[in-house]
Amino acid sequence: MKHPPCSVVAAATAILAVVLAIGGCSTEGDAGKASDTAATASNGDAAMLLKQATDAMRKVTGMHVRLAVTGDVPNLRVTKLEGDISNTPQTVATGSATLLVGNKSEDAKFVYVDGHLYSDLGQPGTYTDFGNGASIYNVSVLLDPNKGLANLLANLKDASVAGSQQADGVATTKITGNSSADDIATLAGSRLTSEDVKTVPTTVWIASDGSSHLVQIQIAPTKDTSVTLTMSDWGKQVTATKPV
């Protein structure tokens, strides 16, 4: 069996680490269209909203995710990703991603099923089994109530309501704060900051329709960089079969 080049393996690993770690985002165009309003709630309201969002996120077992990256984020090869993930009864994910393989940008499709990551990276239309995903990255971390998005919401520091916005077409309350760099590293599968950085500026957009769903989260690991994840279709059940 011919093994894929190391650069392709590394990029495929990046798919796995990001698709279910940070995954999904609205574009900058969406952010540009969002109209800020004066903050209508106190910082106490921010804590309450984050608590409600945390509780809601802990109950999510599947969703659609979109990821977008601005700037050169350390240790992050994926620049764009869109896919679906669910963790009940087992972790399954499908989607597509754009990655840096060496100095070249490549598009790839991926399927994660039965504990294996399959991708056509480097061979469009022909899938390669990149092995047991659990040995590369714990793909269930995104929806893990103790390590994933729920954990970030529960531990967002210096939280403050920054107004109301439309995020991905959903009415939301925008909250700014800071996340632990270690928590971000756990979620991303690799450290996105230097070792001496302790916190990462984080902004979240929480649905104001009563569901308290986390619609969007954006982190700024380093100067002039950002990673934005947008969620939808909460509760979605994802199915997939091993690619032929």
UniProtKB/Swiss-Prot annotation:
Q: Which Cys-Cys disulfides exist here?
A: none
In terms of Gene3D superfamilies, this protein maps to:
2.50.20.20
Signal peptide positions (record): 1-24
Localization of this protein: Cell membrane
Instruction: Cite the InterPro entries for this sequence.
Output: LolA/LolB/LppX, LppX/LprAFG
The record's listing under Pfam families reads:
LppX_LprAFG
Record GO terms (molecular function): lipid binding; receptor ligand activity
**One cellular component term from this protein's GO annotations in UniProt:** peptidoglycan-based cell wall
Q: What CDD domains would the database entry show?
A: LppX-like
Q: Which domain of life is it from?
A: Bacteria
Purpose: Constitutes a host TLR2 agonist (toll-like receptor), shown experimentally for human and mouse. In host cells full-length (acylated) protein acts as a TLR2 agonist, inducing human and murine macrophages to produce cytokines, inducing murine dendritic cell maturation and cytokine production and inhibiting antibody processing in murine macrophages. Binds diacylated phosphatidyl-myo-inositol mannosides (PIMs). Does not induce murine macrophage apoptosis or necrosis. Non-acylated protein does not act as a TLR2 agonist.
Its family? Belongs to the LppX/LprAFG lipoprotein family.
What's this protein's name? Lipoprotein LprA
State the species of origin.
Mycobacterium tuberculosis (strain ATCC 25618 / H37Rv)
